[in-house]
Amino acid sequence: MLQGMSQGIMQVVVIGYVWPEPNSSAAGQNMLALINQFLSYGHNVTFMTAATDSIHKTDLDNIGVSSEAVALNCSSFNERIEKLSPNVVIFDRYMTEEQFSWRVKDACPSAIRILNTEDLHSLRQARHDAVKAHDNALRASKETAASPVVAHIANAAKEADYNTPLAQREIAAILRCDLTLVISRTEYALLTDYYHVPAKQLYYHPLNLSLIHI
């Protein structure tokens, strides 16, 4: 679907959870690569965020991207997004979708809403909790993991709980959007096979380092 967005000039709005910091995190690299992909198509990109300013953020003006600070829980966002009249709105992580998606839908009902997961936060948290619980059980029994560290973590992760409140929130955000970008095939399979998210609402979009220009 992203390839299909290369025809004609569109107004693209990215609503970030934080400012893009490609030198600080993989998430920052992924966001900058996505922005550069839309710029390579010739689209106009505006980056909006409610996050505080950061000395580590990339210089968006330098790559031709307008940036704006927005307020949470404020109707001024509705007025601004309506004026921008975007064709596409990208939400950086499910938390941002929860905050702004309904406002975008009200102000710009024809805009395509895309969720950029970065990764599945609920999956990462479920695996972390499972490994921690497994380690606690070993300590309580005064045993140690007999398998190598990687195998130990993999075995513990098999016991992960995928039906947490966090998972419900994240899946709800995915289902509300027209399209969700997924960076790993494992996550894609989990979404389609376990959560039964329609494949037409998902797009496998791994990190593309060639599109990162810092």
Question: Which residues make up each language-model segment?
Answer:
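N-terminal subdomain of nucleotide-sugar transferases
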Residues: 2-57
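Conserved nucleotide-sugar phosphate-binding/catalytic loop shared by glycosyltransferases and other
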Residues: 55-76
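Short N-terminal targeting/anchoring amphipathic segment
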Residues: 81-99, 114
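Active-site proximal beta-strand in glycosyltransferases
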Residues: 108-125, 133-152
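Membrane-proximal helix-turn-helix segments that form the acceptor-binding/catalytic region
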Residues: 139-179
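Helix-loop-beta element that forms the nucleotide-linked donor phosphate-binding surface
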Residues: 176-182, 188-209
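Conserved small/polar residues in nucleotide/adenosyl-binding loops
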Residues: 212-214
